[in-house]
Swiss-Prot record:
Organism superkingdom: Bacteria
Function description: Not known; lacks the phosphorylation site found in other PtsN proteins.
Family annotation (InterPro entries): PTrfase/Anion_transptr, PTS_EIIA_type-2_dom, PTS_Nitro_regul, PTS_SugarTrans_NitroReg
Record-given protein name: Nitrogen regulatory protein homolog
Organism, as annotated: Haemophilus influenzae (strain ATCC 51907 / DSM 11121 / KW20 / Rd)
Molecular function in Gene Ontology: protein kinase activator activity; protein-N(PI)-phosphohistidine-sugar phosphotransferase activity
Length: 164
């Protein structure tokens, strides 16, 4: 699965600021509810992200984090992705000790988690590529961020193609 099949341009936020990881998760949950879920899941999304983070830090190193969580099917029956480029890095307790300024959040329906394991591995590989990170950080708009993901996807074989 390509990034552009999972993420939509409308779910990219550029130039946002947060004081903490908790405020970031609150904002992701609010954004998801406001833009996608039509007032039926903000608290559930926040709690799922926050509880999942307690199990293990989602910082990938080099200033990027990929918070992810299982969400009830009653909240959404399809995966939801949000990308954020922060104005100011936040302390994230990442394993490398570096603050985080790029966030790729992924909310997966609880009945589809197994399907997304290979997708997560592919996302992590792409999101930790130093050239991709450099381009994402230098992007000045959500459109430029989207273009980075489109270019990244052009060089990818989709998961479905690999299975055949």
């Amino acid at each position: 699965m390509k990034i552009t099949e999972l993420l939509s341009p409308e779910n990219i936020r550029q130039g946002v600021s947060f004081s903490s990881k908790k405020r970031l998760f609150e904002s992701i949950a609010h954004f998801v509810e406001e833009q996608i879920l039509a007032e039926k899941g903000e608290q559930a999304c926040f709690e799922c992200l926050f509880e999942r983070e307690k199990l293990g830090n989602s910082g990938l190193g080099n200033g990027i984090a990929m918070p992810k969580a299982k969400i009830p099917v009653t909240v959404s029956d399809k995966a939801i992705a949000v990308f954020m480029q922060l104005d100011n890095p936040i302390d994230y307790d990442a394993f490398d000790g570096k603050p985080v300024d790029l966030i790729f959040a992924l909310l997966i329906p609880e009945n589809q988690c197994e399907t997304y394991i290979p997708v997560l591995a592919s996302l992590i590989e792409k999101l930790t590529d130093k050239n991709v990170l450099k381009q994402l950080r230098s992007a000045k708009s959500a459109d430029e961020i989207w273009q980075v993901f489109e270019i990244t996807d052009q060089s990818e074989t989709t998961f479905e193609e690999v299975k055949e």
